[in-house]
Swiss-Prot record:
Family: Belongs to the krueppel C2H2-type zinc-finger protein family.
Keywords (A to Z) from UniProt: DNA-binding, Isopeptide bond, Metal-binding, Nucleus, Phosphoprotein, Repeat, Repressor, Transcription, Transcription regulation, Ubl conjugation, Zinc, Zinc-finger
Gene3D superfamilies from the UniProt entry: Classic Zinc Finger (3.30.160.60), DNA breaking-rejoining enzymes (1.10.4020.10)
Cross-link (Glycyl lysine isopeptide (Lys-Gly) (interchain with G-Cter in SUMO2)): 55, 171, 202, 252
Presence of the UniProt keyword Transcription regulation in the record: yes
Region: Disordered, residue numbers: 197-242
Disulfide links within the chain: none
GO cellular component, one term: nucleus
Name used for this protein in its record: Zinc finger protein 397
Coiled coil feature spans: none
GO molecular function, one term: DNA-binding transcription factor activity, RNA polymerase II-specific
Species of the source: Bos taurus (Bovine)
PANTHER family: ZINC FINGER PROTEIN, ZINC FINGER PROTEIN 37 HOMOLOG
Positions of the SCAN box domain: 50-132
Amino acid sequence: MAVESRAVSTPVPQNSQEQELILVKVEESRSWGQKLKQSGSARSCQELFRQQFRKFCYQETPGPREALGRLQELCYQWLRPELHTKEQILELLVLEQFLSILPEELQIWVQQHSPKNGEEAVTLLEDLEREFDDPGQQVPATPQGPPMPWKDLTCLGAAQEFTHIQRQPLKKQLKPWEPCLPPKSGCENNESAIKKDISGEKSQRLSQEPSFGGFSEHKSSLEWQQGSAPGETLRRSPSQRASFSPVIFTHKLLANRDHPEPQRNLILSTNSVTYQKVPTEERPYRCDICGHSFKQHSSLTQHQRIHTGEKPYKCNQCGKAFSLRSYLIIHQRIHSGEKAYECSECGKAFNQSSALIRHRKIHTGEKACKCNECGKAFSQSSYLIIHQRIHTGEKPYECNECGKTFSQSSKLIRHQRIHTGERPYECNECGKAFRQSSELITHQRIHSGEKPYECNECGKAFSLSSNLIRHQRIHSGEEPYQCNECGKTFKRSSALVQHQRIHSGEEAYICSECGKAFRHRSVLTRHQRVHTVK
């Protein structure tokens, strides 16, 4: 595999002063990046820098060179090329764009789970297994009748640019609600009429919209289709939430038969992508907390559970509760053993589609998540996160009983069973219980007689891999256990322990009949026969 480049191409500074400034910023950013990595807050800060980069306005700087420099700085702080590989940076950009194209209802749900990459976002959506009432509503584009009012479309920057839309430089500081219209041309009279029309609709609309920090939040769902013809259907695009900018580009639908031809040509010449707003009467149910609207009251009720934390769907088996019935259905497959998703390669079945997707990577050998420290690759980002704790020494999971910490939650759960005495894994044959599933699997080989570990030298098979390792030392002659006192070596650690009792004088095995002590259990066993004969 080729060595991954971590460089991000940026415009070259025009003078030495700018170059020195950028170098200082890079060094400060690297130093701060290490602190963030240690404190565990890098994720939230990365999101903050992303928002600052996307919301940055030209009017915040005195000139174009300063604006470009500030954008470079914000982009560097967001994407962190000194910490991330080229593939990881691309993953961040793809994830951002993927979230932006989701329907509104899914956007909110996925963002609350904070996926770290596109694979995690897809897994969340597949686990949801719920069809929304209006995932991609088809709305007819009817040019007949009165023109529909338009909401504002916030400028989102390079990652969400709309092709063929001409963006003109602004001559003054615009207010959040002030439209950016095309430059004056021969149709000045038509433009003034357009401005008046848009301004009238805007003033009526602003009184009804909530305000957040001085900016109007534009929640409308926009219908888009490039080069659409009358009567064709348009696909709904989600609102671009959390992107407020003083530079607002307003696109007004004037290409209807009630306007003169010059007016229609003026608008369509500056915007070859046609938009259409879903009428508000089709979404009469509005959330009082976040302002999202829904077609049906049941959809609003389900959405409000995000804010209230209500979980009305309870499992009859274990009592666990869920906010959606689809979650409960997925959970109940644990108890029923139903596995509806089957691998076409090996036939193995799973109870969730996301589990099947992860399993398929075993067959494809795909390992897209690579460790920057040692280069080891993993099929899932969660595996990479756990692996990186080896390098960082991070152990975020702490036992409340004894304070011992662990790098994985599963290890903490197993450890806590020492304190609780819980043994959840029970053998169906003899009823013996174990703390870990691996112990149960090993035990069941006693009943089944299975010996999956075979010696390549002599063909002898064993039920435990540790037994095979010890056996192979017979062929290799390896004796890894050495006595510190005399230097003698042994194949097994137990043999070394017994040998060390010669030097220490320890006699660990005591006869309960006469009190005589022995170094080896086998010697004690032979001695006890003396008492048995009597």
